[in-house]
Regions:
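Conserved substrate/cofactor phosphate-moiety recognition/catalytic segment
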Residues: 51-102
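Glycine-rich phosphate-binding loop used to anchor ATP phosphates in small-molecule kinases
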Residues: 85-136, 169, 184
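Phosphate-binding P-loop
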Residues: 27-34, 97-98
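A glycine- and Lys/Arg-enriched "phosphate-lid" helix/loop adjacent to the NTP-binding pocket
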Residues: 127-175
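NTP-dependent small-molecule kinase module
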Residues: 176-220
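Conserved lysine of the Walker
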Residues: 47
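The Walker A (P-loop) glycine that initiates the GxxxxGKT/S ATP-binding motif of P-loop NTPases
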Residues: 38-41
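Walker A (P-loop) phosphate-binding loop of P-loop NTPases
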Residues: 44
C-alpha cells in the first residue's frame, strides 16, 4: 500500500451527462469482478462534484474514498489540520474495501506514477479499473475555479502547482488509460460535463470537435 500513500500525499486537493449509462460491465466474469473507479483530472476540473453525482447514480458505486472530504469532517474549519489523519483513514478504508472485494472509487490528479503499480496490483487481484478523465482546456478555468472555491471556504492550491500537475497529468494519462478496462473522457469546461470519448473494447468518439482538442493534448 506504499504506492497508495505516496499518491494520496501528492493529491490532497459538475453535474452528470444526460446520456450516462450504468457502468457495471456485462458478462459472467465482469459481473462478478469488483470495480475500482478512478476519477482523474487536474486540480479545479471538478472531480469531486463529478464523482459525487456520477458514481452513485450511474456507476452503482456507493463507496467514494476522498481524503479532502475526510479531512473536512475531521477539522471543518481548517481541513489542512486533518490531512495527515485523513490520509491514514483513506489507507485503512481502501484496505478494507479491497480485502472485501467491494467496488469503490477515488479521485486523483494522476500527476505521478505511484498509482500505476498499485492499480496493477488490484487488477492482478481480479479488480476491473474504470477510469473517468475530467478534462478542462488550459489553466485559466482551473485557477479561477480554485480561487472561487477558496472564497466559499474550500482549500487552496497555488497556481504553480495547478500548472505543474496538469502538465504531468496529461503526460501520464496514456499510461493510465492503457491500464484501464474502461475509459471515459469528459469535457468539464462548461456548466455540465460532456462525454467526449469512451473505450470499452471499441473506441467511440461522442463529440468530434472536443475530441480533437483533447487528443491534441493527450494523444488518445
Amino acid at each position: 500500500m506504499r504506492e497508495w500513500l505516496e499518491a494520496v500525499r501528492g493529491d490532497i486537493e459538475s453535474a452528470v451527462p444526460n446520456d450516462a449509462v450504468q457502468e457495471r460491465p456485462s458478462g459472467s466474469y465482469a459481473e462478478s469482478a469488483p470495480v475500482c473507479h478512478v476519477v482523474a483530472g487536474a486540480n479545479g476540473c471538478g472531480k469531486t462534484t463529478f464523482a459525487l453525482h456520477f458514481l452513485p447514480r450511474y456507476a452503482a458505486c456507493l463507496e467514494f474514498v476522498n481524503p479532502d472530504l475526510i479531512a473536512g469532517g475531521l477539522s471543518p474549519f481548517d481541513p489542512a489540520r486533518g490531512a495527515v489523519k485523513a490520509g491514514r483513514l483513506v489507507l485503512e478504508r481502501v484496505r478494507e474495501l479491497s480485502d472485501a472485494r467491494r467496488d469503490f472509487g477515488f479521485e486523483t490528479t494522476l500527476s505521478g506514477r505511484g498509482y500505476l503499480t498499485w492499480l496493477g496490483g488490484l487488477k492482478n487481484r481480479g479488480y476491473r479499473i474504470h477510469l473517468y478523465y475530467v478534462w478542462v482546456p488550459g489553466v485559466s478555468i482551473l485557477t479561477a475555479r480554485i480561487h472561487q472555491r477558496v472564497t466559499a471556504g474550500g482549500h487552496f492550491v497555488p497556481d504553480a502547482d495547478v500548472i505543474r500537475r496538469r502538465e504531468r497529468s496529461i503526460r501520464l494519462m496514456k499510461e493510465y488509460a492503457a491500464l484501464a478496462d474502461k475509459l471515459r473522457v469528459f469535457d468539464n469546461s462548461g456548466p455540465a460535463p460532456i462525454l467526449v470519448y469512451e473505450k470499452n473494447g471499441d473506441a467511440v468518439i461522442h463529440d468530434a470537435k472536443r475530441f480533437e482538442q483533447v487528443n491534441r493534448e493527450v494523444g488518445l
